[in-house]
Amino acid sequence: MELAMDNSYAFNQRSTCNGIPSEKKNNFLVSEDHGQKILSVLQNFREQNVFYDFKIIMKDEIIPCHRCVLAACSDFFRAMFEVNMKERDDGSVTITNLSSKAVKAFLDYAYTGKTKITDDNVEMFFQLSSFLQVSFLSKACSDFLIKSINLVNCLQLLSISDSYGSTSLFDHALHFVQHHFSLLFKSSDFLEMNFGVLQKCLESDELNVPEEEMVLKVVLSWTKHNLESRQKYLPHLIEKVRLHQLSEETLQDCLFNEESLLKSTNCFDIIMDAIKCVQGSGGLFPDARPSTTEKYIFIHKTEENGENQYTFCYNIKSDSWKILPQSHLIDLPGSSLSSYGEKIFLTGGCKGKCCRTVRLHIAESYHDATDQTWCYCPVKNDFFLVSTMKTPRTMHTSVMALDRLFVIGGKTRGSRDIKSLLDVESYNPLSKEWISVSPLPRGIYYPEASTCQNVIYVLGSEVEITDAFNPSLDCFFKYNATTDQWSELVAEFGQFFHATLIKAVPVNCTLYICDLSTYKVYSFCPDTCVWKGEGSFECAGFNAGAIGIEDKIYILGGDYAPDEITDEVQVYHSNRSEWEEVSPMPRALTEFYCQVIQFNKYRDPWFSNLCA
């Protein structure tokens, strides 16, 4: 058949009027329901059994259809028709792993763009959308199942999502199982969990168990459930148990009760090594799962006379304070305190009779800085010397990153006019060794350091003393602990800050600063190097303490005037930008040490007799 156009009038010829050419006109036509009309026509073809060009062969039925519809809806069929496959030329494909009901349901969706997902058919749709690679339908099934996750079906959905490759459903189901782990691990479905999924469960920090011992019991129970086929996995699963967080007694019992299984799977030596680790370095591992620990804010203050000490702790969960027994911590003027695992480290300071108050301490004519490092073990209430730093220092800061203690800035032994130290050192608590790392880009005074993942941010001033004492916050450094590289950031604060009146804290891997002079909180965006205002708190004393825990910032104590010191504690909830007051400290304090520390519940020395 040949179609021809009558060219008696040339539509593209520009007409003239009185010698003046008229403008050429055009209209752009858009039919908004064009796609739906095409689908309706194709569905009519299907109902009338016309223009079919392909067949799906089932075990008990042959279903005719149109290639264009299959290819438009399914990546499986599109790939089949694009490449030189036998089915393309034969005009048919045989499918054996889907039922006729499933294929017809898929075709109904493909021709109409509509279907109804229910509890009864969602698994069928999930299976066919996975096999036929219908992404929109697969996501709809995944979203439907995510909303239905509960204690009864979560393990089944975890298995289904793993089989069908639904990352979103798998992540949601995995999170649910991890959160309710202690309620699920005794079920028969749990014992049927495949190795890969169990491994994923166990490696998470968020695994909700009352103690790490439960994780070890789960691994042994799962292995014994089908010992012949599963014992090969035991070494891999044992690695996911944080054995160094267990008590020596628990590990010894495991050796005694499971000796045969452990030896046959080459796991006996793993437990033996863990026992040696606990004996030599117990409490020096910061990787305890949050659900197995109690978290505290540790407060310590030595008065100017060097004799009166105040030490107490705040239990995050119970909002209660406890006055701690005398620890006799040697916190020299200008020293720095950091927590690591279940231990507290004190570095440096001045051995002479320097003033403890910062503004008076910096004015001393001579600083007899020390290189000593002390470790305090609250579990044993023991305070002892460890390896000395390479360089004596005072008025520095210390912070933990990559399981090492870093000491940054400050001044070494000498007269008041010596410059700030550029040398930076790191200490490995397990090997008990100090090493030098890359130096600071330039000198910094009043350093504040915070760690966000493996990056240390350091803020401070480039000058030590100004006429008004309060030097400006004009130094901002970034240290990548993984690559041992420093970089200097542009301090785009948007306003003036005093270096001695800000506190830097990390919250959920984000750096925040609290300005104690304006009562405002700012967060830092590492991509743009810009500080964003996050809100204001009611008030805060100068020289207050500030701590970041999970999604919260705690601001504690401080002074409004030399004779007006406060015991107030305020909490900023970063996830909802709200402030609240919590229980006040047992005593009003200013210029004190403030750190977060956590203990395994089974050896928590501060848990009992908490009092406000």
Swiss-Prot record:
SMART domains: BACK, BTB, Kelch. Pfam families: BACK, BTB, Kelch_1. Residues 154-254 form the BACK domain. It comes from the Eukaryota. The keyword Repeat applies. GO terms for biological process: proteasome-mediated ubiquitin-dependent protein catabolic process. Residues 52-119 form the BTB domain. GO terms for molecular function: ubiquitin-like ligase-substrate adaptor activity. Keywords: Kelch repeat, Repeat. SUPFAM superfamilies: Kelch motif, POZ domain. InterPro entries: BACK, BTB-kelch_protein, BTB/POZ_dom, BTB/POZ_KBTBD3, KBTBD3_BACK, Kelch-typ_b-propeller, Kelch_1, SKP1/BTB/POZ_sf. Kelch repeats lie at residues 295-341, 343-403, 404-454, 456-506, 552-599. GO terms for cellular component: Cul3-RING ubiquitin ligase complex; cytoplasm. This is Kelch repeat and BTB domain-containing protein 3. It comes from Homo sapiens.
